[in-house]
């Protein structure tokens, strides 16, 4: 016995999410420098930045190169102007934790896979000095967990993410809200920040295409499709089913008729543009 409780395959904890940062820390892209996460060229930061930060009177020990000649001439006393690099690498992340995401036949639930994908991406953004916003959709509501501007503040948010996941895991709601309804909140958040959505694409809703088109006109939007191997390639055989509206029965699936959910999802997004 080691004294450490092992997290089950269908559960998560804060320590597990913290360890995901190691995947980013070991990434060679981080060593290449702190450039934009989506850039193809990387370079280390140099200089003092170009965004004005403040203007103040000269103090002993200040670098003479920071003198602001205009303010000095206008006031008659030496003044220095400080600069910094604008931190505008903000990303808004959406985690689909509706009831259908609590399903899985290999390794873990789709909900856990969605959380893992978003947390890894969020750690990467923070390592590049960006800010991350986390929005979570459940059967009851869609809400903004908050914005994190540092690794410390993001670590505090992980506790709430774990609590929301566990609450949903212990509920047995049968009906998913439409995805387009759950996504409505993100249109009002984050200004022009890119949006990354981890979802199983269940119950998208009739207005989903229109919503995505509207968002894509103003900001970058990326989908991470979370699917289970059983969805992509179920073994041939008879399968019982029971729908939320009370229908039940059996269906026979042939191997060549396997659900190609990834292809359907990709094709639909391409048609949206």
Segments from the language model and where they lie:
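Exposed, interaction-prone extracellular/peripheral surfaces
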Residues: 2-41, 57-62, 71, 80-85, ...
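N-terminal juxtadomain amphipathic helix
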Residues: 64-66
């Amino acid at each position: 016995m080691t004294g450490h409780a092992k997290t089950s395959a269908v559960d998560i904890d804060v320590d597990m999410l913290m360890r995901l940062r190691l995947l980013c820390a070991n990434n060679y892209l981080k060593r290449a420098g702190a450039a934009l996460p989506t850039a193809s060229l990387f370079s280390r930061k140099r200089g003092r930045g170009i965004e004005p930060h403040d203007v103040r009177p000269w103090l002993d020990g200040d670098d003479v190169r920071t003198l602001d000649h205009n303010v000095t001439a206008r006031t008659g006393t030496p003044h220095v102007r400080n600069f910094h690099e604008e931190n505008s690498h903000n990303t808004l992340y959406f985690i689909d934790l509706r009831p259908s995401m609590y399903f899985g036949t290999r390794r873990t639930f789709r909900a856990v896979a969605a959380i893992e994908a978003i947390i890894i991406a969020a750690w990467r953004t923070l390592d590049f000095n960006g800010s991350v916003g986390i929005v979570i959709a459940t059967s009851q509501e869609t809400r903004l967990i908050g914005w994190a501007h540092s690794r410390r503040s993001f670590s505090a948010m992980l506790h709430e993410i774990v609590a929301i996941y566990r609450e949903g895991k212990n509920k047995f709601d049968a009906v998913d809200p439409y995805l387009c309804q759950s996504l409505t909140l993100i249109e009002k958040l984050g200004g022009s920040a890119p949006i990354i959505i981890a979802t199983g694409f269940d119950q998208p809703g009739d207005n989903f295409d229109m919503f995505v088109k509207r968002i894509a006109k103003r900001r970058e939007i990326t989908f991470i499709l979370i699917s289970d191997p059983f969805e992509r390639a179920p073994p041939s055989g008879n399968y019982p089913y029971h729908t939320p509206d009370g229908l039940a029965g059996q269906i026979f699936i042939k191997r060549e008729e396997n659900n190609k959910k990834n292809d359907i999802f990709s094709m639909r997004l391409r048609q949206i543009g």
